[in-house]
Amino acid sequence: MKTFKLLDYTAQVFYNKDQHYPFCLHLYDNCSGKQLHVGYYVSVEQLCYMTHLEMLDWQYHALNPVKTLLAVDEMKESLYLLMHVMGED
């Protein structure tokens, strides 16, 4: 499991290469402590795209969509690096 701080959210990403959908995302709102989303994805790209959409859907406060995208891009780069280190790229 890898945990990412994404502005007012926390994303926990789980990876299991033996599953059809190897990536699992748990998205939490840090302000309320609520779990907002659980999803299963095929690729890092799909996971990051859907994380960005979920963050925009759940905004209770006016976050800048560009800042949201940049935070998700940092997560994407970290996941690609992790996949490379694990030899899964």
Segments the model singles out, each with a brief description of its role:
Residues 37-89:
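Mixed-charge, Lys/Arg-enriched low-complexity segments
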Residues 1-36:
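Amphipathic, interaction-prone secondary-structure segments
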